[in-house]
């Protein structure tokens, strides 16, 4: 019995994109909340904690729901495709709202950003558990430990890929030049690249 490495890597692409997304979320969203929308650390911290609160309910619910789902494309893929599609659309709205707020601040835009961010977290929650459960579905039980190692490796690759992208787009010298000129960092290219990774994955 031999592990199908190619299939396991393909399955792991979803986890790669999830890890790349969360790296961006944890690093960039707090900066947007505090620097663009001028929220204090308490409010931004509460917003950033929302993903953990939602995960308590969404992950077991959609994991269980996918267990009971049967379609032509399998148990997990409907959730992965739907969640990824919604997440791609919603995450690209965030920098648009941020840029619009920077040009003309308003409370409505702040509220819109928070609402879209919440919907994005829900979208991510719909397919996180199904994506993780996909590997055991297609891997014989004796080989699942090896399969899990590959999945975790793919997640690490997603994190490394994100760091490589940010080191190119937002190098320290470039950030210092923007700050010296009194400008603002535009994160839209980063959101677009991460969403492209999610689309391809």
List each model region and its residues.
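Symmetry-related core transmembrane helices of the 12-TM Major Facilitator Superfamily/SLC fold
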Residues: 81-82, 111-114, 184-201
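Paired intracellular helix-loop junctions of major facilitator superfamily
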Residues: 126, 136-144
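Glycine-rich segments within core transmembrane alpha-helices of 12-TM secondary carriers
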Residues: 50-56, 87, 145-174, 197-198
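Helix-loop boundary and gating motifs at the non-cytosolic
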Residues: 1-54
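Transmembrane alpha-helix termini and helix-breaking/packing motifs in multi-pass membrane transporters
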Residues: 35, 63, 68, 99-100, ...
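Central cavity-lining transmembrane alpha-helices of secondary-active solute carriers
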Residues: 44-69, 82-91, 157-163
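Loop-to-transmembrane helix entry/capping segments in MFS-fold secondary transporters
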Residues: 41-45, 110, 141-151
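Hydrophobic core of transmembrane alpha-helices in multi-pass small-molecule transporters
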Residues: 16, 83, 87-130
């Amino acid at each position: 019995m031999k592990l199908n490495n190619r299939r396991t890597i393909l399955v792991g692409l979803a986890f790669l994109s999830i890890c790349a997304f969360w790296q961006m979320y944890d690093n960039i969203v707090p900066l947007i909340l505090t620097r663009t929308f001028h929220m204090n650390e308490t409010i931004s911290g509460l917003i950033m904690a929302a993903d953990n609160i939602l995960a308590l309910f969404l992950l077991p619910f959609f994991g269980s729901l996918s267990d009971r789902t049967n379609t032509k494309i399998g148990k997990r893929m409907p959730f992965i495709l739907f969640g990824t599609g919604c997440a791609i659309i919603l995450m690209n709205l965030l920098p648009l709202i941020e840029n619009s707020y920077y040009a003309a601040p308003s409370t409505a835009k702040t509220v819109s950003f928070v609402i879209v961010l919440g919907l994005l977290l829900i979208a991510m929650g719909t397919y996180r558990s199904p994506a993780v459960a996909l590997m055991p579905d297609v891997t014989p039980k004796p080989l699942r430990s090896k399969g899990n190692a590959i999945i975790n490796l793919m997640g690490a690759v997603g994190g490394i890929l994100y760091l490589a992208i940010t080191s190119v787009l937002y190098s320290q010298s470039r950030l210092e030049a923007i700050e010296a000129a009194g400008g603002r960092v535009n994160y839209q290219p980063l959101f677009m690249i991460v969403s492209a990774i999610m689309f391809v994955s």
